[in-house]
């Protein structure tokens, strides 16, 4: 009887070790698949009014994450939107000078400075960063400097990351 009990115990322990190893390997593969930079189209009411394309990035590195907007990319999108606005509204240099600007370029420069601050700088200042963990299809974010934790189910299909709770769909860019 004692041999049977020992075999059972050994079998149970080996079984548990196999299950733990499979879970560890599965999560390890998922971690590697998750690491990189992901992007999705981001918008604000102001950006929609201006018809400017914004992109939010989600960067995942070894144990760390951060959300951010690229300043230079946003700058290029804003300048393109300003050009379209001036063309579509048929605004002249005289119209801009009458509004208190020195020139169309001066107007764009002032708008750009303000918009970059209000869109990109404010966003990046408030965007989350911290550590992360995954466990069997659940992604846990732990934000730096706070006790806030955010948990969501996720899946990755064909370089697309689906964060279920928010309904976010991100595409891998790096």
Annotate each PLM feature.
Residues 2-18, 22-23:
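N-terminal Sec-pathway targeting helices
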Residues 39-43, 139-145, 163:
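Short beta-strand segments that buttress and anchor functional surface loops
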């Amino acid at each position: 009887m004692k041999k049977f009990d020992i075999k059972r115990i050994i079998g149970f322990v080996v079984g548990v070790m196999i299950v733990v190893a499979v879970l560890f390997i599965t999560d390890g593969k998922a971690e590697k698949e998750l690491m990189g930079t992901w992007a999705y189209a981001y918008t604000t009411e102001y950006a929609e009014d201006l018809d400017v394309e914004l992109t939010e990035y989600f960067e995942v590195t070894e144990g760390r994450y951060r959300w951010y907007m690229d300043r230079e990319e946003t700058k290029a999108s804003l300048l393109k939107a300003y050009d379209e606005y001036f063309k579509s509204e048929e605004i002249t240099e005289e119209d801009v000078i009458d509004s208190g600007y020195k020139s169309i370029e001066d107007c764009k420069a002032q708008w750009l400075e303000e918009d970059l601050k209000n869109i990109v700088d404010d966003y990046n200042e408030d965007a989350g960063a911290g550590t992360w963990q995954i466990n069997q299809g659940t992604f846990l974010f732990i934000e730096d400097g706070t006790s806030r934790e955010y948990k969501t189910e996720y899946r990755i299909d064909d370089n697309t990351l689906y964060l279920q709770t928010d309904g976010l769909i991100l595409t891998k860019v790096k």
